[in-house]
């Protein structure tokens, strides 16, 4: 499994990740907003997913880790989300509606991304060289209903992938892609789809951009 970019090792990190996820739904981090967000399937699932990731790091957290894994498994079956807690996902994840979503645990998803019902992120296998390839998603990326992202594919920051598209090749920054296979039809970016995000995630995105240059 690739080295984690978003390990959530400190309790302050856990609070920030949960707040960033909640902000994507409620545009607020107040206690009342948390109570309203708790009834949203996507937020409830990511809450336990983040907790699993945090509590997995220390032996004395093992009881809480096991409880969170049980809760995560329950909501995985209830909502149809197959997003393992080990998956490397940045803060500010928004899951639109509940239904089948399948993410390979070795995939990587950036900060402030949208995932919709029917999204699949899967591997490809180079049989000759015995190598597996997994998708990576940048920041502020929006994947619409039924999108499939397969294999050694990188979708750059700000990209939008339309309903039912199958992505088998990389997409550049702010690309808008549709179809099977996905083809770029514009470079207008994802601002209209991603919307507002938690201020604490902005420096994280800036640091990630600097690190990639």
Feature roles, as predicted:
Residues 125-129:
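Right-handed parallel beta-helix
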Residues 1-79, 190-213:
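Terminal amphipathic alpha-helical/low-complexity segments used for targeting or macromolecular assembly
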Residues 131-150, 180-213:
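C-terminal segments of enzyme domains that contribute to small-molecule binding surfaces
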Residues 79, 84-85, 90-91, 96-105, ...:
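Left-handed beta-helix
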């Amino acid at each position: 499994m690739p080295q984690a970019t978003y390990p959530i090792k400190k309790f302050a990190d856990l609070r920030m990740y949960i707040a960033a996820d909640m902000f994507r739904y409620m545009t607020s981090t107040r206690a009342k907003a948390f109570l309203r967000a708790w009834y949203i399937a996507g937020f409830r699932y990511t809450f336990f997913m983040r907790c699993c990731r945090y509590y997995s790091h220390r032996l004395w957290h093992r009881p809480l880790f096991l409880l969170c894994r049980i809760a995560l498994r329950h909501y995985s079956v209830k909502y149809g989300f197959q997003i393992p807690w080990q998956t490397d996902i940045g803060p500010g994840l928004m899951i639109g509606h509940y239904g089948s979503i399948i993410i390979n645990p070795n995939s990587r998803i950036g900060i402030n991304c949208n995932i919709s019902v029917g999204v699949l992120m899967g591997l490809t296998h180079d049989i000759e060289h015995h190598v597996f390839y997994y998708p990576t998603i940048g920041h502020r990326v929006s994947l619409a209903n039924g999108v499939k992202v397969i294999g050694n594919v990188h979708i750059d920051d700000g990209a939008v992938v339309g309903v039912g598209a199958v992505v088998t090749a990389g997409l550049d920054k702010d690309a808008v892609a549709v179809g099977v296979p996905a083809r770029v039809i514009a470079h207008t970016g994802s601002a209209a789809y991603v919307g507002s995000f938690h201020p604490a995630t902005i420096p994280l995105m800036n640091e990630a951009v600097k690190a990639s240059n």
